Amino acid sequence: MTENEFLDLAAEMLKKNERRLRKRTRNDGKFTLADIFDRHTWKNIPTAEHSQLGIWFSAAVSKGYFPQILDAHQQNIHWHNLYKLRPLEQNKEGEQQQ
């Protein structure tokens, strides 16, 4: 899988699963790269590629490729760190106030 193919797939999975990720209550609402993907999709990606995919994902986040994550909180460059989205209510209120 190339970097662009992976980033396109990640964007598709984020769009598809963002609502589920925002509702997440386990682990204080935090999630890992594997949580973004559907279980079946993530299992189809060879384990040996996971760390490289994490590097690509983190770099893309820091460049603003996934604004819903970059905007949500300060992210760390390491793929295994957790990312946290703002609750939906805060997003709606914040947008209305601005």
Locate predicted features.
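Generic hydrophobic/packing signal
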Residues: 27, 39, 50, 75-78
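Positively charged, polyanion-binding regions of nucleic-acid-associated proteins
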Residues: 2-30, 39, 43, 62
